[in-house]
A protein has these predicted regions:
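Active-site gating loop/helix substructures
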Residues: 125-238, 245, 252, 259-261
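Small-residue-rich anion-binding loops in enzyme active sites
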Residues: 1-19, 170-176
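Patatin-like phospholipase
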Residues: 14-22, 27-138, 144, 150, ...
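Short active-site oxyanion
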Residues: 46-49, 216, 321
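C-terminal helical/tail subdomains of lipid-metabolizing enzymes
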Residues: 130-132, 137, 141, 145, ...
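Amphipathic alpha-helical surface "interface" segments used
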Residues: 96-103, 169-175, 372-388
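Acidic, Ser/Thr-rich peripheral helices and adjacent loops at domain boundaries
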Residues: 257-299
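Hydrophobic/aromatic beta-strand patches that form the interior of the parallel beta-sheet core
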Residues: 51, 169, 242-246, 322-326
Length: 392
């Protein structure tokens, strides 16, 4: 998993902007984010804020809950453990996409049957056998192993007292409202982030049970929105932002030719959470605020002290935002089960892909100097031809 980082020169990342890491949900694909983070560390990218949903919340908690020198090791420990239940020594010898596809589906079926070490185990008797309303009747799997794993790999005292900001999203089951558990906000309220907040962000029904926090019950945030970019942009307007957004599902893809391909494509669209649309909308909001500021600057002096002008000044305040957008691109042999195929070979491949994509981004220095002209928000997408500047 670290074979790509030995002989690559590190690029220089601008220091003036607050560095943010945004991690989408995506189950077994999450090792792509771990590989991306390892490569970012090699390039001295030290996030001051990590926001995640579902598996992104778990990765985010491991990053925020450890000192810098231990983060990659803890991420490796988690992903080695999660993939230890599906290790087949002969798997790397498979070269045929068709055979590899069969292997992936078999691995996913085994995971669905036996669970993932340190993450979840199947309930026995199964959920339908238990009385309605009992905790065991609400999900097919028991996630108590994940709590023990988080307690072991994450220093929650560090999260609740250290400088790295952590934000994880979940949905309130009763209200249907999206909520973020944010250690910065919690500190002001005298509250603390714990394993339950991370588990709530990843409690995808009906596989995983809801998580109770202060009398309210929560499910996976990906049900409402699988990418926490909007939250970051909404809650930081005073400082420039340099955001690495690491997504696990691509909104773009080919028209399916089979039922299996249709199932995968549907999942990609659903969990990509309209990322490009959200980015475009935020860009339009930034540009509108910029236009308001320009208009205010042209007002006669007699209008400067008008309360309405003061209000417009306040609401139009914006920082400069650069988003570097990395998206995991599915392989031909992957299907709709890719997010619960915790096989060792899949984990290693996803990790390596995350590393490669970060190095590819760093090979295009145009974004490093933030060449934004007079624009307040720009996005760079990594595509097959390199890092592409997206004009919204």
């Amino acid at each position: 998993m670290d074979q790509l980082s030995s002989d690559k020169p590190a690029a220089t990342i601008p220091a003036q902007a607050q560095r943010v890491l945004v991690l989408q949900g995506g189950g077994a694909l999450g090792s792509y984010q771990a590989g991306a983070y390892q490569a970012l560390c090699h390039h001295d990218f030290e996030p001051k804020w990590v926001a995640g949903i579902s598996i992104g919340a778990i990765n985010a908690a491991i990053i925020a809950g450890n000192p810098r020198e231990k983060r990659v090791g803890k991420l490796k420990e988690f992903w080695d453990m999660a993939s230890s239940g599906s290790v087949m020594p002969w798997a790397p010898l498979v070269r045929s996409d068709r055979v590899r596809s069969v292997f992936n589906e078999t691995s996913a079926a085994l995971i669905a049957t036996f669970g993932v070490p340190g993450f979840f185990t199947p309930r026995f008797p199964p959920a339908p056998v238990w009385p309605a309303g009992s905790p065991e009747s609400q999900s097919y799997y028991d996630t108590s192993p994940l709590r023990a794993t988080l307690d072991r790999l994450v220093d929650f005292d560090r999260i609740n007292n250290d400088g790295v900001r952590l934000s994880v999203g979940a949905v309130n089951i009763k209200t249907g409202n999206f909520e973020y558990f944010d250690n910065y906000k919690f500190r002001k309220l005298g509250k603390k982030i714990g394993p339950e907040h991370i588990m709530a962000s990843g409690a995808l029904p009906p596989g995983f049970p809801p998580v109770e926090i202060e009398g309210e019950f929560y499910w996976d945030g990906g049900i409402v929105s699988n990418t926490p970019l909007d939250y970051v942009l909404e809650h930081e307007r005073d400082r420039d932002l340099l955001i690495f957004q690491v997504d696990l599902f691509s909104a773009r893809g080919e028209v399916p030719a089979t039922v299996l391909e249709a199932a995968e494509r549907e999942k990609d669209i659903r969990y990509s959470s309209r990322t490009r649309m959200n980015t475009d909308m935020n860009k339009k909001i930034h540009d509108a605020k910029k236009a308001v500021r320009a208009l205010i600057a042209k007002l006669p002096p007699s209008f400067k002290d008008d309360p309405l002008v003061a209000t417009l000044n306040a609401v139009s305040k914006e920082s400069t935002v650069t988003v570097v957008h990395l998206i995991y691109r599915s392989k031909v042999h992957e299907a709709s089960s890719k997010d619960y195929d915790f096989s060792r070979i899949g984990m290693v491949e996803h990790w390596a892909a995350g590393e490669r994509d970060v190095y590819a981004s760093m090979a295009h220095p145009e974004w490093l100097n933030r060449p934004q002209s007079d624009e307040s928000m720009v996005t760079y997408d990594l595509c097959e031809s390199g890092l592409q500047y997206i004009k919204q």
